[in-house]
A protein has these predicted regions:
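Short, surface-exposed recognition loops and adjoining beta-strand edges that mediate ligand/DNA contacts
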Residues: 6-11, 15, 44-46, 140-158, ...
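Membrane-proximal, proline-rich intrinsically disordered regions
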Residues: 1-52, 290, 372-376, 380, ...
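Inward-facing hydrophobic residues that define packing positions of alpha-helical scaffold repeats
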Residues: 94-97, 182, 189, 234, ...
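Conserved, well-structured interaction surfaces
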Residues: 63-140, 176, 193-201, 325-335, ...
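Short coil/linker segments at helix-helix boundaries
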Residues: 139-183
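Short, solvent-exposed loop/beta-turn-alpha elements that line the ligand-binding surface or hinge
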Residues: 61-86, 164-172, 414-425
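Extended ligand-binding clefts on enzyme/binding-domain cores
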Residues: 15-35, 173-176, 180, 224-235, ...
Length: 483
């Protein structure tokens, strides 16, 4: 029945939220997206806090945050963690969406209520399949470049509910072109919007909706550099829902992104950063490059960040609830209205409409910056302004790494940058004293902007082409004396 399929959707497709994420590495699949980009760094101070450095920084974080050839490789080189968790998890969930979409075809709803429920379940299923494929293609394939998306290797695209196995083939699944994956994502999101139009979602927030589908669709079109459609999807959403949270009225004890935030359209999964980015020795901190983007009258500067308690670094502040708790909002699978303003502003900027882009930025900033005076940008400055605003607002929400990838292939205004990561090494066997900082560099157009296909997948599908990542060695050593 429809209600059975609804239960399957809830139990096997939506990502549940965890209680008490002790450390980033204990979070959901994809937790490492937060430590790849230029918004964070590690902390150099006289002494590490034992808890963090001894376990996670050495074993779980090193390979990801310094863009190693093997992301699961520990700092000392003696451990190698599996790299297939995200791939396996999302393809398993996708497989269930395929089964649901197959089975719902065979149902004959007996009542009008059942008919509407079936439409809603279809909408949710198409949305989730799209969201999962979108994440996969942006991790395991190159960014969408309109010039070559038809020929660039994407990821396996499975849309059937049955098991496909041909014993005579060395490879069961082939990597289809990036363009084909995006085509399917757009198709799924349009289907979701259509089903939700006929049968609107009543349980917002933790269940997919037409609004969430429109927002994700506008993001997908941005990644495709299809500016007109990105504009249209964002505009369609903002006509339905456009309320921004006024950051001026966030109370001293409240976090910005919580269950009561009116901007949130959808969330699934956990808050991985409950205990992360403390800015203390042995942990990560917020990068100066990000922190310096906020003017002193920008409410976000004090809301999102705070000085660390035991170093001169910047810690993550009250963007999310801090300390161990049951997750109510995700930092990776979150969709909120703010993004629609930034998406439509970017689309305007790319369509040579600087005044339209300026208008959207001004409306947005009135809710973010004290005493904001409207500014009218010209075509020469507006794209950079939109990108800066996106970085300010959406930091630590799983956007920045993907934005850097897509900016690098942007036909209209390419932005390519190298990233340097200082990896702080402490004497983890005894006194936790700082030893040295090792600098690693992600070059412009570096192959490590794409993840290798997991080893276990290549062992099963022996003919599948891999994404080759280079060996990465440190480029310099930083010594600091705290005596």
């Amino acid at each position: 029945s429809v209600s059975d399929l609804d239960e399957v959707l809830l139990g096997s497709v939506y990502i549940p939220s965890k209680e008490e994420v002790q450390d980033l590495a204990w979070g959901d699949i994809g937790w490492w997206l937060h430590i790849l980009d230029d918004d964070i760094n590690t902390v150099i101070t006289d002494q590490a806090e034992n808890r963090i450095w001894n376990s996670a920084m050495n074993s779980a974080y090193f390979g990801y945050t310094t863009w190693q050839m093997e992301v699961g490789r520990s700092y000392k080189g003696d451990e190698l963690a599996a790299d297939n968790a995200l791939w396996d998890d999302l393809y398993r969930r996708i497989n269930v969406t395929n089964i649901i979409l197959d089975e719902i075809e065979d149902l004959n709803p007996a009542t009008e209520e059942e008919r509407l429920d079936a439409l809603r379940v279809r909408g949710e299923t198409h949305f989730l399949r799209a969201q999962f494929y979108f994440l996969l293609v942006n991790i395991y394939a190159q960014a969408y470049d309109p010039e070559n998306a038809e020929t660039t290797l994407g990821i396996p695209l499975k849309l059937t509910g049955y098991v496909e196995h041909d014993k005579d083939k060395a490879s069961q699944f082939e990597r289809v072109p990036v363009a084909k994956v995006y085509e399917q994502i757009v198709k799924d999101l349009k289907a979701a919007v259509d089903y939700f139009t006929q049968s609107p979602q009543t349980r917002l927030f933790y269940r997919a909706s037409g609004e969430a589908s429109l927002l994700l669709l506008s993001r997908v079109y941005l990644y495709m550099q299809d500016w007109k459609n990105a504009w249209q999807a964002a505009d369609d959403l903002l006509k339905i829902k456009s309320s921004l949270k006024d950051y001026a009225v966030v109370k001293d004890e409240d976090e910005v992104i919580s269950r009561t935030n009116p901007e949130i359209l959808f969330s699934q999964g956990s808050l991985n950063v409950q205990n992360a980015f403390t800015g203390n020795g042995g942990d990560f901190c917020i990068a100066n490059g990000l922190y310096r983007l906020y003017a002193d009258n920008d409410y976000r500067k004090e809301l999102f960040f705070t000085p660390a308690s035991s170093s001169d670094s910047i810690a993550l502040g009250r963007k999310y609830k801090r300390g161990l708790h049951q997750s109510y909002v995700s930092d990776l699978f979150l969709l909120r209205i703010s993004e629609a303003y930034l998406n439509i502003a970017e689309a305007c900027a790319m369509l040579d409409d600087p005044s339209g882009a300026s208008d959207w930025l001004n409306i947005f900033r009135r809710n973010r910056i004290e005493g904001w005076q409207d500014v009218s940008y010209d075509q020469n400055t507006v794209i950079e302004e939109v990108r800066k605003e996106r970085r300010r607002e959406l930091c630590i929400e799983g956007h920045r790494w993907f934005d850097l990838r897509r900016y690098a292939v942007c036909r209209k205004a390419p932005l390519r940058k190298a990233i340097e990561r200082v990896f702080a090494v402490y004497d983890w066997d005894s006194k936790m004293k700082f030893m040295r900082g090792e600098v690693f560099r992600l070059e412009i157009d570096d192959p490590a902007y794409v993840f290798s296909i997991p080893k276990s997948v290549l062992e099963f599908d022996t003919d599948m082409p891999d994404n080759v990542r280079p060996m990465r060695r440190l480029t310099e050593v930083i010594n600091a004396n705290f005596d």
